[in-house]
Amino acid sequence: MKYILLCMCLLSLLGCGTDTKTQQDTKPTTTANEQAKIDQGQDAHVMVAKQALSSGDYAKAIEEATASIKDNPNNADAYSVRGFATALSGDTTKGLADTKKAYDLAPNNVANYYNMAMVYKLQGQLNESKQWFEKVLEKDPSNTWSVYGIATIYADQGDDTKSLDWLEKAINIDPSVKAVAAEQDHFERFHNNTRFKTLVGL
């Protein structure tokens, strides 16, 4: 359940990164029309992969991202989506390798920063995860789900005050966070906490 909610959060981030796709086909015989068809095909695979990831169909997301990578081995978006989907499927080591590859290809892709944070979080590397959420916030200070991600990390680390401070920031950006926080296991132990109950409306 919590992974489905995380994917819903991802849906809000899918378009926040810089488009960093570059075509490195150096064949002199490729016309502009042929190149446009190639680019559209790659975009189609990544779009389907992102939709599949958002709906929780990780196998389809991996399949489509892999097809995009086959067409263009330098497609950072495809590596990022495949990495996150792979991690959510249970292979966090392989998922981290793909998100790191995406970062190497496109170090300014903010959407990949979020995916990197989530993969580290799935591995239990909370400090590294928090650093990547903070990188998202450097570029996009009102990124709700990165603020929320930091709140969950502090909750998991047992720092109740910081957790609730960050949760309050997330709710102030987007009140829909209340419903997510009320249901996620990160905050289960807070259900008798007066401040938490006030924040989420329990």
Model-derived features with residue positions:
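C-terminal motif of bacterial Sec signal peptides marking the signal peptidase cleavage site
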Residues: 13-15
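Terminal, low-structured helical/coil segments at or just beyond the last alpha-helical repeat
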Residues: 20-36, 172-202
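Alpha-helical segment of the N-proximal tetratricopeptide repeat
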Residues: 38-77, 81-84, 88
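Structural signature of tandem alpha-helical TPR/SEL1-like repeats
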Residues: 55-64, 88-101, 123-135, 158-166, ...
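Structural marker of alpha-solenoid helical repeat scaffolds
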Residues: 71, 104-105, 139, 173
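Canonical tetratricopeptide repeat
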Residues: 81, 115, 149, 183-184
